[in-house]
């Protein structure tokens, strides 16, 4: 029998040809596509070229970066790049779509709009971080310039406060004097009114006393001497007994 021939080692499919030398500062389009049909890979390459023609010339392509793909998969994700380690943002999932097979592939417009939105948000975040850094760098110089201005302003404020405080003290004294004067006038007026009331009440009381004395004198003159009470004579018990004995005799 002829000796058995050893099987030739199958050459690995070059899935990462397009992504051998990736620029970390440029965005990357990751595509996981099924190997059972060549249509999946062709669609991925056509999508990448169409996006570059639309204006995304820095967009890079990476096919099946995680190894063996899933059956019927056509998964798209984007890494914006330029900020160190970037998380992949999912753009499309063909496993959740189909049959028919045509539903597994997105249109160029849908993918383009999503990528532009993600890159625009990243650009805004970069600008914000740059402005914050520049403001932090400028802070020490601005503080040094602002500190003498603050000291000068505080000195001026203190100087302005000194005359204002004296003027306010004078005003307060004047107000106190003006308040005390009307109170004194009011107290004098109250005393005078009380004295007038007393003087008015005294002649009235004297008149009443004179009238009362005159009425008492008139009553005493009008009473006759016969009006005095006469003492009533009462008989004693001994007189009654003697009178009764005389009658019997």
Swiss-Prot record:
InterPro entries: Selenoprotein_Rdx-typ, SelWTH-like. GO terms for cellular component: cytoplasm; extracellular region; Golgi apparatus. The modification Phosphoserine is found at residue 147. Residues 1-22, 122-249 are annotated as: Disordered. Keywords: Cytoplasm, Developmental protein, Phosphoprotein, Redox-active center, Secreted, Selenocysteine, Signal. The keyword Signal applies. It comes from the Eukaryota. There is a cross-link at residues 34-37 (Cysteinyl-selenocysteine (Cys-Sec)). Expressed in the developing salivary gland at late stages of embryogenesis. Also expressed in brain, neuroblast and wing disk. It is found in: Cytoplasm; Secreted. Residues 199-210 have a biased composition (Basic residues). May be involved in a redox-related process. Required for survival and specifically for salivary gland morphogenesis. PANTHER family: SELENOPROTEIN H. This is Selenoprotein BthD.
